[in-house]
Regions:
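A penicillin-recognizing enzyme superfamily signal
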Residues: 3-6, 52-58, 62-249
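Active-site-adjacent helix/loop patches that line small-molecule binding or acyl-intermediate pockets
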Residues: 1-65, 104, 108-111
Length: 250
């Protein structure tokens, strides 16, 4: 799944969607703040339901906040000329998803920038990797008329849509890349302007990292690229659980 996320290989999204059942994705989207008459159809896994930039940003912010939804606000506080606070926003926090499950996704979505995952196709974030100074989770997406780039870490969430305002097809290959470069410039500018030191997520106690082949998900063969993949300790792949059992019996 890490490779599928990195390269936007949609067959895995479709198979997972059909395996879990269409209603599962509809309910998850609504939990993450995307509402409306969402159709429970197979193509929903491909992003066929229209959402706004704000809706998508709010949904990804839940991942950035480790499973907690925080009500967005334009004004966080108001002060006097003497820096006396006369108003401070008190955002509402709601737990939406399990922290450990979100951590697995956050780690997996960093792979969009991993050039070592280039096999048949290149991960979609590789063209902007050299512009980034720290770790981000991200996902790109596209249709004939839209190009998306959404990414985050514990400090910031940014979503960028690019396309024509008259819904014309985006036909020039150069035009499909603008969103990614705008996104990279935006997230990096945040650190330059604020002087904030980048942070990343602490691995939960019930999560384990294992060095495996990101292409097969199994232990790598000789000379094969390996990557740290993350699992819930209670939900390890069968071959790892079997190996642990064999080792404990020797």
């Amino acid at each position: 799944m890490v490779y599928a996320l990195a390269t936007s290989d949609n067959i895995y999204a479709m198979k997972t969607h059909l395996f879990l059942g269409p209603d599962k994705l509809v309910n998850t989207l609504k939990r993450f703040g995307i509402h409306g008459n969402i159709p429970a159809i197979p193509s929903l896994a491909l992003g066929t339901y229209e959402v706004s930039v704000l809706e998508l940003t709010k949904a990804y912010a839940i991942l950035a906040n480790e499973g907690v939804a925080i009500s967005p606000s334009i004004i966080t506080k108001i002060t006097t000329m003497d820096d006396e606070i006369i108003y401070k926003e008190k955002p509402k926090e709601t737990k939406i998803a399990n922290q450990s499950d979100v951590y697995l996704l956050n780690e997996a979505m960093t792979s969009i920038f991993d050039n070592n995952l280039t096999y048949n196709i290149r991960p979609t974030g590789v063209p902007i990797r050299s512009l980034l100074s720290t770790t981000y989770s991200a996902k790109s997406g596209s249709t004939d008329t839209d190009n998306w780039m959404v990414g985050y870490n514990p400090d910031i969430v940014v979503a960028v849509w690019s396309g024509y305002d008259d819904a014309r097809n985006v036909e020039l290959s150069e035009d499909t890349k603008f969103g990614k470069f705008i996104w990279a410039d935006s997230v990096e500018a945040y650190y330059r302007v604020t002087g904030t030191n980048p942070t990343w997520y602490k691995t939960p106690d019930d999560v384990i990292e294992i060095e495996l082949s990101p292409f097969s998900g199994f232990y790598a063969g000789f000379g094969e690229y390996t990557k740290k993949l993350y699992f819930r300790k209670k939900n390890l792949p069968w071959y790892i659980s079997l190996l642990k059992e064999e080792n404990s019996n020797t």
